[in-house]
Structures are given as structure tokens and as C-alpha cells.
Amino acid sequence: MIMFPTSTLFIEGCDLSGKTELIKKLHTTMDYKWHIYDRSQISRKAFNELYNRDIRNIKDDYNNEINNLNNRFVILVPTWKTIEKRFKKRGDEIHNILSLKDVYTKFEDVATSLSGLPNVFIPRYDQANIEDSVIMHLDTQEHSLSLSDISDQVFNAVTYSDELEIYSLSFMIYDDCQFEKADDTILTNEVEGEYYTKIMNSLLKKIDDELSGKNEYDRIESSKSRRFVYTDDSCISFIQVAVRDNVMDFHCVLRSSDVENTFQYDLKFLYFLASKCFDRLELESEEINKVRLRFNLNSAHTVQ
């Protein structure tokens, strides 16, 4: 079973939008399942623009946070009438009604501009229980997505970017060691099959050599070795397999990813390759409780 976990859940919106109340309800209902933050780099960037601040590295900070697809963002956009009513009832430590309207308008624009991102969710504000829709959305994201769904999210993130390139994009998935979606037919892919087979043979040979002591130290490595590595200057440029704390970590760096035409196949291949490494290391699911697959796409792009 594949899991696409939430690393950090950010609750966003203008002042008096209901962020604090939603966070309390999510924590209470889900028993603190998620690491939840009130505001993110989205707010920092919005206020930087609204108040003409000059915050160094803000673009990098913003991109690093939002281009990690395990970070998920909920943006609350109530009606202005709702905000105005709350202000009249309890006021605000910072804003008067005019400055509050400026912030509201800014966050309306922000929500519109980010609404197409795969890790941004904007719940309908006329629902009785917004927390239920957030919980349902996150449960779907974490437990019900296929590899194709995940590669679609990567594609959607890139096509939503101004330059049709994200440099860089990252995400992580877990598997329960059963690798139910591993499919060896990926090796017969018309375009990439030969390339995938070359990578697989190279990494598996490296693992075999290290386990049998065929290295410059004539030293037999264990399953916890740091030396199970594949490197190349092609698009899939780095893979490392390591076992730590009852987890098999499978880390991939792709120097260049055509998310429109090939990444969907790359992801299926790398998932399949992780299953082969698990078998080759003779790991048992009783000893290893999960497999963590980490992906760094240094240039996720569409062909232009």
C-alpha cells in the first residue's frame, strides 16, 4: 500500500478567517495527527508584497516550502461580510476596518492565484463543518492516490508555474513493504525500457558486489551499508539505498525531469526498482516496517 504523507499542514487566510478555530477542531478530531502551522511562507510573501517589505531570500523560502508536495496548504476564504461581522464583534489588535479589507483583498487574490496547485485546498466556506472536508481531502491525498495520480500532481505543479519549470521540486511516499503496485512491464516501455533496465542492472550489481565484498576494501557490507549507490549524468542521476531504524530509504535525484512525457514512467520504474532492492537485500517485512521513497527533481519541466 502506498502512502503520500503530509509533512506539515499549513492553515492560511486573512485575519479573522477562522484559522485558529479550524486548527483546534482538527487537533481535537484527529488527536493531533498532523503537524499544523497557523500561516506559512504564503502569508510572509503576501505581507511582503502588501507592505512593500524587503525580506531577503523570501522567494527561495517560499518556493522551497510550496514546492515540497508533502507540505499541504488549506486556504480559508470566507465572505467579506463574515470577516466584517467578526471584526465588529471582537475587533482586532492590529487592523482597523480599512486595513483589514486590504488584507482580505490580498488573500482573495492569493487564493485565486494558488487554487490550481495540487497541494493547495480551498474548502467551501458555506459548509457546516469545514474541518470534515479538510479531513476527507487529506485522507484522500494520503491514502487513495496511485502512482499515476502522484505524477499528475507533479505535472500540475509544473504547468502552474510561470516558467513551466520548478527548480527544485520534492516529494516523499511510503510503502508498507508489499509493493502491491510494482510492475515489471515498465521494463518493456518502448521509449525508456532499455534505459531503465540498464539502471536496474547497475544498482543491483552494486548491491551484490558490496554484499559479497567486491569493493576496494575487500570488505563484506551488511544491509546497513552506505555504499549501495547508483550515479550517472543522465536524467536519473543518483539513487542511494540504505536501511536505518527499521526503514529502507530509497533516495532518488533526477537532474532533469520531463513531467509531461516521461516522469510518469520514471516514477513507476523507480518504485519497481525499490521493490527489487528490497528483495535483493533479503529484507523481511517483519524487520522493516516501511519503505521510504524520496524524490528530488532538480529541474521538473515541460518540453518547450
Per-segment meaning from a language model:
Residues 136, 140-304:
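Terminal, non-catalytic protein-protein interaction segments that mediate quaternary/complex assembly
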Residues 11:
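Hydrophobic anchor at the beta1->P-loop junction of P-loop NTPases
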Residues 1-3, 92, 105-146:
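NTP-dependent small-molecule kinase module
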Residues 28-74:
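Conserved nucleotide-sensing/catalytic segment adjacent to the nucleotide-binding pocket
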Residues 21-22:
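Hydrophobic positions on the alpha1 helix immediately C-terminal to the Walker A/P-loop
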Residues 67-112:
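A glycine- and Lys/Arg-enriched "phosphate-lid" helix/loop adjacent to the NTP-binding pocket
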Residues 14-15:
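The conserved Walker
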Residues 18:
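Conserved glycine(s) of the Walker
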